[in-house]
Each structure stands twice: as C-alpha cells, then as structure tokens.
Amino acid sequence: MTNLTNILGVGTLMTDAPLLSDDSSKAWVTVGELRTMVEAWRDQLAGPRMLVFHYIPNTVEGVAQLLGASSAGHVIALLDPKLPAQAKADLVDRYRPGIIFDESAVRLQGTPCDLHPDLAVLLSTSGSTGSPKFVRLSASNLDANAWAIVKVLDINATEVACGHLPLHYSYGLSVLTSHLKAGAPVHLTEKGFLDPSFWPQMKRWEIAHLPGVPFHYTTLRRFGFTKLDLPELRVMTQAGGALDMRTRKIAHDYIDARGGRFHIMYGQTEAAPRITTLAHEDFIAHSETVGPALPNGGIEIVGANGAPGTEGEVIFHGPNVMMGYAENPTDLALGDEMGGRLATGDIGWLDEDGRLTITGRAKRMGKIAGLRVNLDEVERALNSLGEEFVVVQKGEVLLFYHLPNEDMDALKQRALKQLSDRFTLPKTAYKFKEVDEFLRTSREKINYQALN
C-alpha cells in the first residue's frame, strides 16, 4: 500500500523550494510548509482505512487534505464541490464514506469498508453529473502517468503551472501530479478565464505552463492570444476533447513565435488520464493527429487489418491503465481487472510512425468545457419529467430535441430546473429544438447518429 505523497516525491524535495499557491496566497507555500500541513492531516485522520469523499477545491488546503488522507492510508474519491445537494446525498447513501471533506468542514462518519490494498483514488466517470460510477486508480497508475507527462513535456522545477482546471477532473489532477513529480510549482485558482482578475493573477505568479480544454482555447482565440500579458508563458497544452483546426493553428503559431511549445494531447480518465501527446515540432506536418502513445505505453487498433491508416477501435496498453470501475462499495475490494489494457471506445487510426488520429466516439459520452458528460444520464433525468427528450452534443452545447407542447416556455423552465438541480453545467450549455418527430432506426430506436 503506497501513498501519493511518497510516489510524487513531496517527501524528498528540498524543504525551502516553492511548490504551491492559491487565490488567498501572499507568497509561495514551500515544500516544507506543505509537508507540515500534510502531516497534520495525516495525524488527524489516523485510524482504520476508510473511503474518503473529498469535494476538493483548487486550494493548497485541498491538496494538503488529499495528500494527508492518502498518507493515513485512506482511499480518496475526488468529487466536484459544486454538485447539487441531492447528488451528494445520493452518492453518500450509495457508498457510505467514512470521512467527508466538504466546504472546509470535515465529517467523520467512522464507517470502514473493504478496500483493496492497491486502491488509492476514485474519479467519477462523469464528474458534472455526479455519476455513481467511479474509475479505480492505484498510486502506481497515477505515478506512471505523472512520470510519462514529465518526460514527454520536459517539465522542470522552474516551470510554474496554472492550476485552474478542477482537481476532481483527471486533466486537472494530472497537471498537479506531474508538476509535483518534477518538483515544479503550481498556482491553484478557482477563478476562470472570464474572471477579470484571472489574467493579472497569472502574470503575478509568473505562469509558464497553461493547460486548457477546447472551451478555453476558443475563448482565447476570440479574446486574442496576442493580448495575453504573460511574459513567462512557454508551454500550452490542450486535452479534454477535439479542438477545431483553426484554433489549433492559432494557438500553435502564437506560442511558437515566443519560442514556446503547444501540445495536443488525448486521454481518458481510465488512463489516469494521458494516452498520447503530439510534440510541438510535429504539429505543422501532423496537426490533425493527437500524437503517439506515452513513452511507457502503446496503442493498437482493433478491427483494422494492420496497415497504417486503417480505422478501428483504439486500444491503449500501459501501466497507467486503471484497475477497473466501481459502481458500489463492494467493487472497492476488487483488484486489477484490466491488466494494463484499455478499450477506449474511440475510433481512430495510426500513421506509419504511430501517431493517432481520432475519428469518432463509439459511446454516448460527450465533453462540455472539458468535462465528461454521460448523455444517456442527462436524457433520463429530463425524461423523468414525463415528456420525451433526446439529447445530443453539438460542439460545446447539449441540444435537446423535443416534441411540440402546448406550453413550451413552462416545459423549458421545468427542464432547466431539473438540469440545474442534478448537474453542474451552466445553463448556456443547454439548447432546445422542437421537432415533429424523432428520427428512428429500423428497430424503432432513436437514431442518434442521424441527429448528430
């Protein structure tokens, strides 16, 4: 049983090295100061091994709680603090966690459960909907992912990362773990790109590494990359869904002119989460790809005839592949069910040098602002109102097809309330469209492909 503090190297770094800051910080929290915070939480949480629900904020204290709970030997489920109260209650009822961190309060339930010795962290498969289905990750999974990211992005101890992505989101967590692995500082923030104070704050903390999902890069394109006042910025990374080619090129050209690097990446929470990274120098010739597999992983295309360029399901092999899923407390006792092999559910092909191009998704999972959304789960929530809705993703919005109704305004208001009560996506992510009938297949099933 190995805890995250040991694997990420926090215990071995120079004591006075700057490591973390957040929105309330006046100065960097050093390795030694963080170590003291972690040890305090470890001692407070000492006792039988338990499941911890951590509605984790992007703060130094939130990270100290995570590492402290891990040091005490507990398993931590990282959850969205903005989840509606009912969604939180449903998760607690299902899993009965022994410890809950929520809004700076700590509740000790005192409920131990059977946890596999290798299990370290749980991440939701659809964080914005509070899905009860978790990805089970070992400390070794997270360590392998962090090591590979450090290597492929060449992260060094002087590179300050912007920790604006939520820590319950696998991409946000990987920014933190990879930089801790390299001994590199991270400035954590709860602010977003559209907050007027965000950019001056990034300049103040001398941000060199800016990660983002398609929403962030589209926003920067509209705002104007050249208006960014970040003198230290050298690395930009993009994951969390497909970015349109125009925005890819603008981002690449902007950072290239500064002597920096732009990396397109691909991953899944089930891979802790990184699978591929496109090198900056390969962008011009291979901008449509997401790059080759990580140094410690490999990709095969199932259903293809073996020739480069032949489409099939993307299968990833690597030490960062999850242990498996959990849908109830009993599953938390299970060991590794994957054997380092992940069937991604995505369709794609490899070129002669092993670079992957993604051409589609085989499952009904979407991504809005980088957050994974189970479209079937959203659809079920609306259909519980007694009206039939069909949901598909269109770019950065969810489009709800519905049949004519005598009082459409009232129906939309009921639908929006149901969505806001259950999920954390903003109302701007929801659009409605009236149709006379739903397109269906010959088996009378909804034809989602045609609607898309």
Regions found by a protein language model. Name each.
Residues T2-L4, L8-P18, L108-S124, S131, ...:
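Conserved pre-ATP/AMP-binding loop-to-beta segment of ANL
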Residues T15-A46, K88-A89, S140:
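Conserved AMP-binding/adenylate-forming core of the ANL superfamily
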Residues A27-G32, L119-W147:
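Conserved AMP-binding A3 loop
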Residues E313-D376:
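Conserved ATP-binding/catalytic segment of the ANL
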Residues G366, E396-L399, K417-N452:
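Conserved C-terminal "lid"/linker of ANL adenylate-forming enzymes
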